[in-house]
Amino acid sequence: MILNTGARTDTAQYYSEWLLKRFAEGFVYTRNPLFPNKVTRYELSPDKIDAVLFCSKNYAPILPRLHEITDKYRTYFHYTITAYGRDIEPGVLDIGESMKTLVALSKLVGKQRVAWRYDPVLLTDQYTIERHMDTFAHMAEKLAPYIDRCIFSFVEMYKKLETNMPELVPISEADKERIAEGLGKIARRYGIYLQ
């Protein structure tokens, strides 16, 4: 079984102590979001878990004790760092702090177990294609020696997002092509596998 610790929330950032306790005790209860009365118990013993997948925007809270998991389980880490500031993501670290934390994570677990996520790509009057290219180039130069790959995607426009973020500029197919080509060119310059 592959255990995804970050599918519903940023567990590494907000619930590190809880997560470490679950691994120490060897089980976790999860509630089915579609059927709230259905609760399942999962055994977390290393012989039952093939790999643990982490997805986070901030691994700093768990780094000092991460070895409690990595010493026993195969792991892979997705680290999301984008161009966006607190105007878009209020709880996120600034880019410099996030990059330092990614480097520290990579030094602990090895670059082959760290993917940098630059997603989702969205456009506003402030977050233009040019700004994405500049920010991505800056980050790619610094992060290339510490990552296995970079994963990017485009924001999916759905009704709730359009309501909550009216400042979003729709991304045309031409914009997508331009962004993908630009990110690809930058990634190649720094030897980053981009997917």
What are these model-predicted stretches?
Residues 84-92, 120-130, 164-172:
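Surface-exposed cleft-lining segments at the edges of enzyme active sites
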Residues 1-88, 95-111:
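Conserved Radical SAM active-site core
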Residues 97-163, 180-195:
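Conserved C-terminal portion of the radical SAM core fold
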Residues 169-184:
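Substrate-binding surface in catalytic domains of secreted glycosidases
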Residues 55, 153, 173:
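Catalytic beta/alpha-barrel core
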Residues 9-13, 142-148, 167:
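Extended interaction regions within the primary functional domain
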Residues 9-16, 95, 129, 133, ...:
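Generic detection of long, well-ordered alpha-helical segments
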Residues 48-53, 136, 170-171:
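Short, charged low-complexity intrinsically disordered segments located at boundaries
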